[in-house]
Amino acid sequence: MIKDFNESNIRNIRSSGISTKKLEDFFSINQYPNKNEIKDFANYYQCDETKIKNWFKGKRDRLKKKSSNNEKSGNKFYFK
């Protein structure tokens, strides 16, 4: 079965730059979308609202982990 863009779902979002762009752009403005915004994304991607919520949660978690790792690496002292 051949899928067109409208039939793709959120689990394929990382492999498609087209799909990711909308979510990434929105995330850069607002990391916590409201129910209506989540519903709009779910309709656009034709998937469950839960998948959209999980994408935003995962993105926030990855960002938090990345900033935490950057802080840890910046605070290392080396003595000779």
Curated annotation (Swiss-Prot):
Name of the encoding gene: hbx7
Stretches the record annotates as Disordered: 60-80
Keyword set includes Coiled coil: yes
Name by which UniProt lists this protein: Homeobox protein 7
Gene3D superfamilies per record: Homeodomain-like
Purpose: Putative transcription factor.
DNA-binding region as annotated in the record: 8-67
A Pfam entry, by short name: Homeodomain
Single annotated GO MF: DNA binding
Keywords of this entry: Coiled coil, Developmental protein, DNA-binding, Homeobox, Nucleus, Repeat, Transcription, Transcription regulation
SUPFAM superfamilies hit by this protein: Homeodomain-like
InterPro entries for the chain: HD (IPR001356), Homeodomain-like_sf (IPR009057)
Originating organism: Dictyostelium discoideum
Residue stretches of biased makeup (Low complexity): 70-80
Annotated compartments: Nucleus
GO cellular component: nucleus
